[in-house]
Amino acid sequence: MREIVHLQTGQCGNQIGAAFWQTISGEHGLDGSGVYNGTSDLQLERMNVYFNEASGNKYVPRAVLVDLEPGTMDAVRAGPFGQLFRPDNFVFGQSGAGNNWAKGHYTEGAELVDQVLDVVRREAEGCDCLQGFQITHSLGGGTGAGMGTLLISKIREEFPDRMMATFSVVPSPKVSDTVVEPYNATLSVHQLVENSDETFCIDNEALYDICMRTLKLSNPSYGDLNHLVSAVMSGVTTCLRFPGQLNSDLRKLAVNMVPFPRLHFFMVGFAPLTSRGAHSFRAVTVPELTQQMYDPKNMMAASDFRNGRYLTCSAIFRGKVSMKEVEDQMRNVQNKNSSYFVEWIPNNVQTALCSIPPRGLKMSSTFVGNSTSIQELFKRVGDQFTAMFRRKAFLHWYTGEGMDEMEFTEAESNMNDLVSEYQQYQDASISEGEEEYEEEVPIEGEE
C-alpha cells in the first residue's frame, strides 16, 4: 500500500531523519525498539507507508542511513530510537567528504553509492506499490549535498516513474557553517532542478528565528530546530499515513503544486507554534491556525512571501476540523491577500484534511507554498557564489577531485535561469496572455 522509501544522507540529513522517525514512531504508537503499544486501529491501518512489519509485533522503518563517516551514524544508533533501524541499512564510509561537494558526488561518494543502491533496491522490492522516495539532506555540505544529489540521480535512473521528494536544508543568509557553502549549494540546486519532483526548503536561520521569537527559547539547540522540521515532515505525510476525508499523496501534492516542472521549490510552515509549556492553556481555532500558517514569521525558509506571489499552495489540516470552516477560512485569506496570489491560476489553494492530530495537540496545520519569493534564497546563494567564483577561490579543492570549471559555470547559469523563471511568472498577468493569444490567431489563418 503506497510505500515510501526514506533516505537520509550526511550529518544534517541523519539528524533531521532521526527526529522525523522519532516523531512518527510516536504518532503510530511505537516505542524505541519498534514494538507497537498504541491504542487506536488507525495507527496500524497504514503503518506500512513508512514501516516494514517484522516478527513479534515489531515495526522497522523503511529507512536507508548514509554517511561518508561513521560519527553521525554512531550517534543515531546510540540515540533513543537507535534500535528502531535495521542494522543492514546503515551504509557508511570512513573518509568523510570534508564539506567538499566533489568528494561526495564524484570520488568518495561514488565509491559508496552502489552499496546504498543495493539497500534501496532491497527495500523497494519489498514494497507492494512503491509511491516514491524522500530524502533528507543539507545543500551546504559535502555528503548530504554531493552524495545526496548523486543518489537522487541514480534512483531517478532506476525508478523514473516514482516520486522524488527532498527535504533540503538550504544555506541561511547570516549563519554560515562553511566557507564553501555557496559552491556546494549551487552545484546541488543545479541537480535538484533536474532530478527532484518536489523540494521542501528549510533554512536554519528561519528555524532559529522561530525558536527565539515564537517559542521564546533563549539558545535553541539543533535538537529544537530538528524538532520543528520533523513536525513539518510529519504534517506533509499525514495524509499518506492516516485515513482522511480529503487525502493527498506525494504525487497529488506535486500535481497541485508544480505549475512548471522546474519550479518545484516549496516554502513550508507549521501551526500552532507555541512554546513547549504554553500550548495547554488555550484552544486553537481554525481561523487562528490559518492566520498563523500564512504568517511570514512561520515560514521555515528565509524568504518573505510578501516580496513575491504564490503560484500555488497547499494546506493540510489535522484534527477534528470542520470541512466547511476550513474552506471558508482559506477562501477568506485568498480574498484578503489576493495580490499575493497569481490570478492566472484560479483555484490555487489546495486543502487536505486528516482527522488524527499530532501528539499533544487538538488540531494543527501544515502549510506548503510555491511562492516566487523563494528566488531571494537562490539569489543570495548566487551572489555569494559569484563573489568567490570570480576569484576562483577554493576551486582547487573541487578541480582536484576531477571537476571542471565548466561545471561551475553551468550550475551558476542554471540557478540564474531558475531565478529569472520565478521572476517571469511573478510579473505575468492574465491580460498579457490574452493579448498574445489574439495576435497569434490571424497568423495561423494566413497560412
Swiss-Prot record:
Tell whether Cytoplasm is among the UniProt keywords.
yes
The compartments listed are: Cytoplasm, Cytoskeleton
- Where along this sequence does the record place binding of Mg(2+)? 69
Q: What is its main location?
A: cytoplasm
Q: Which CDD domains match?
A: beta_tubulin (cd02187)
Which annotated residues bind GTP? 11, 69, 138, 142-144, 204, 226
Keyword Nucleotide-binding among record annotations:
yes
Q: Where is the composition biased (Acidic residues)?
A: 432-447
What is the superkingdom listed in this entry's lineage?
Eukaryota
Entry keywords, A to Z: Antibiotic resistance, Cytoplasm, Cytoskeleton, GTP-binding, Magnesium, Metal-binding, Microtubule, Nucleotide-binding
Q: Which GO terms describe its cellular component?
A: cytoplasm; microtubule
Q: What's the reported outcome of changing residue 198 to A? A: In resistance to benomyl and benzimidazole
Region: Disordered; residue ranges are 425-447
Q: Which GO terms describe its biological process?
A: microtubule-based process; response to antibiotic
Q: What does this protein do?
A: Tubulin is the major constituent of microtubules, a cylinder consisting of laterally associated linear protofilaments composed of alpha- and beta-tubulin heterodimers. Microtubules grow by the addition of GTP-tubulin dimers to the microtubule end, where a stabilizing cap forms. Below the cap, tubulin dimers are in GDP-bound state, owing to GTPase activity of alpha-tubulin.
Subunit structure, briefly? Dimer of alpha and beta chains. A typical microtubule is a hollow water-filled tube with an outer diameter of 25 nm and an inner diameter of 15 nM. Alpha-beta heterodimers associate head-to-tail to form protofilaments running lengthwise along the microtubule wall with the beta-tubulin subunit facing the microtubule plus end conferring a structural polarity. Microtubules usually have 13 protofilaments but different protofilament numbers can be found in some organisms and specialized cells.
Family in the record: Belongs to the tubulin family.
**The protein's name in its UniProt record:** Tubulin beta chain
Q: Tell me what organism the protein belongs to.
A: Botryotinia fuckeliana
Q: Which gene encodes it?
A: tubA
